[in-house]
């Protein structure tokens, strides 16, 4: 009965949440012409709910490659804001009014900085000027975004651009998400060993940076990301984190990395790890699920609860690691939490039934329930 009541309560709360979510537009589509670049940019503007610009100045996150990546990230961020797992902020995806073939050429033009003064192919400098002098003022005027709290998120060439933007305009953004950056472009001297970049790293007072890449990507991505992380770590005023996503390649790392990036920059990092583990578990990627859970337990032990211990025990049971499964279930026994019925009937724990410790565990739960 207790399990039924809990399930109904969760179902009711979830139904209310989704009913609320269906009435909230995911993103507004607008077009902003840039006289600097000579391009009409399509903006995908996702607003927090409720949105009260008269009374609030909202942090804003600009993200690149919105042509192909916006939908899922906007929906995820919107739901996490409604459930208060993320702070309220505005998201602005920068895209193009074009077709996929032209999009590839345009991102090369905009995201790659000119390698020297004779480089007329790459226009990263003009694109950065568009963001600084046209897009940012537009958002501050029309949506009340906070001029002191801007973020930038980029992937691949976009990650290169995000890093380079810090080199050129160190005060423009306070939060950076750099995913699988193409920092091999121009070799280390172009950014990582550039005197202007190193000077900005040394003098920065307040910056939060998230760096990520997949373990199955070309080694260049991991090597350059690690070099970037090591340079940023030299300044204690820069909060920098680096995550390697196991079994993810250049085509798949985006979804995992953006989820963690949003939580790292705008949310509770413990909740980020737990939700990430749940996502991996649902996809039956148990190795990655356990890595996220164990990291959460290690870094934030005071935030873990009984259900977290129960969930990780179930994942270990599904992988055949009975020792760790019993270890976490025993923690529940020690905390004297009533989990007897739930443990007895959970099919995720079926692999433990033949173990001699199973009966002992159930008896311990029964004894704890009577105390």
Regions found by a protein language model. Name each.
Residues 343-371:
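Terminal, low-structured helical/coil segments at or just beyond the last alpha-helical repeat
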Residues 300, 320-321, 351-356:
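Alpha-helix capping and inter-helical loop/turn segments
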Residues 288, 324, 357-360:
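Alpha-helical positions within canonical tetratricopeptide repeat
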Residues 20-280, 286-306, 315-319, 331, ...:
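Non-catalytic cap/lid and distal C-terminal segments of serine-dependent acyl enzymes
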Residues 1-24, 371:
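Bacterial Sec-dependent N-terminal signal peptides
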């Amino acid at each position: 009965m207790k399990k039924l009541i809990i399930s109904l309560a969760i179902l009711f709360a979830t139904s209310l949440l989704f009913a609320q979510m269906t009435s909230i537009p995911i993103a507004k589509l607008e077009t902003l012409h840039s006289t600097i670049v000579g391009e009409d940019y399509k903006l995908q503007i996702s607003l927090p709910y409720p949105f009260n610009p008269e009374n609030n100045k909202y942090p804003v996150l600009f993200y690149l490659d919105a042509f192909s990546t916006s939908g899922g990230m906007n929906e995820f961020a919107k739901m996490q804001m409604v459930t208060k797992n993320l702070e309220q902020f505005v998201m602005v995806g920068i895209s193009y009014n074009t077709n996929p073939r032209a999009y590839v050429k345009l991102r090369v033009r905009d995201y790659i900085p000119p390698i020297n003064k004779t480089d007329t192919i790459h226009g990263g400098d003009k694109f950065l000027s568009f963001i600084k002098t046209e897009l940012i003022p537009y958002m501050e005027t029309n949506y009340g975004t906070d001029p002191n709290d801007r973020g930038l998120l980029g992937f691949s060439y976009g990650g290169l651009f995000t890093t380079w933007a810090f080199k050129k305009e160190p005060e423009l953004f306070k939060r950076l998400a750099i995913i699988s950056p193409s920092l091999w472009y121009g070799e280390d001297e172009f950014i990582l060993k550039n005197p202007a970049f190193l000077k900005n790293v040394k003098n920065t007072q307040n910056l939060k940076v998230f760096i990520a890449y997949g373990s199955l990507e070309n080694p260049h991505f991991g090597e350059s990301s690690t070099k970037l992380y090591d340079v940023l770590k030299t300044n204690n005023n820069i909060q920098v984190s680096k995550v390697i996503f196991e079994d993810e390649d250049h085509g798949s790392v985006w979804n995992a990395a953006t989820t963690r990036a949003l939580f790292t920059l705008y949310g509770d990092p413990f909740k980020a790890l737990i939700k990430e583990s749940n996502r991996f578990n649902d996809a039956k990627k148990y190795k990655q699920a356990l890595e996220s859970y164990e990291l959460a337990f290690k870094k934030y032990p005071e935030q873990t609860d009984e259900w977290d211990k129960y969930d990780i025990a179930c994942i270990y049971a599904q992988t055949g690691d009975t020792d760790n499964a019993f270890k976490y279930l025993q923690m529940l026994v020690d905390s004297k939490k009533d989990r007897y019925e739930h443990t007895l009937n959970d099919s995720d724990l079926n692999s433990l039934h033949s173990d001699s410790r199973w009966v002992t565990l159930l008896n311990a739960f029964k004894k704890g329930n009577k105390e």
